[in-house]
């Protein structure tokens, strides 16, 4: 029997928590992907402690009950859908323009790297896993075997 897997993206905290909690619509990367479909979000063991002290990040984390000390690490946090991947075509200090014509501003802009040439991955439909799945992360998109813990019944829809 063929074993199916789910694509997983590892992210440093606090970025993983902010994405999963719906504080930003996009995850920015220096590379594009043609993949569209189910995706799991993995919080790596690393925490960017400086970013956690920066406003508005500190307040957004606090709104969701997090501090730099209690962010979950080394776990798959949630599943979602990777719906699109847009290239950043222009940016200044407060906004960016994506190749789809969308203008990114506010917290979405502050929570990503919108350097021209980078890519904004549009991700939606988050389901928080209960409990989180402890696993070592990897670079790029990687596969995790689908098991009961990734089934819809063991998740809570958060946005």
Where are these regions (language model features)?
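Structured alpha/beta reader/binder surfaces that contact nucleic acids or chromatin modification marks
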Residues: 2-159
């Amino acid at each position: 029997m063929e074993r199916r897997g789910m694509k997983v993206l590892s992210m440093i905290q606090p970025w993983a928590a902010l994405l999963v909690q719906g504080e930003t619509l996009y995850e920015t990367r220096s590379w594009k992907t043609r993949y569209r479909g189910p995706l799991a979000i993995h919080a790596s063991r690393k925490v960017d402690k400086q970013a956690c002290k920066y406003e508005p990040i500190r307040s957004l984390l606090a709104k969701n009950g997090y501090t730099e000390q209690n962010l979950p690490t080394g776990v798959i946090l949630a599943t979602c859908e990777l719906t699109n991947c847009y290239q950043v075509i222009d940016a200044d200090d407060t906004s960016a323009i994506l190749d789809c014509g969308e203008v990114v501003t506010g917290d979405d802009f502050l929570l990503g790297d919108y350097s021209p040439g980078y890519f904004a991955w549009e991700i939606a439909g988050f389901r928080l896993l209960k409990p989180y799945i402890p696993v070592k992360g990897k670079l790029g998109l990687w596969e995790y075997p689908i098991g009961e813990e990734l089934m819809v019944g063991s998740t809570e829809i958060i946005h």
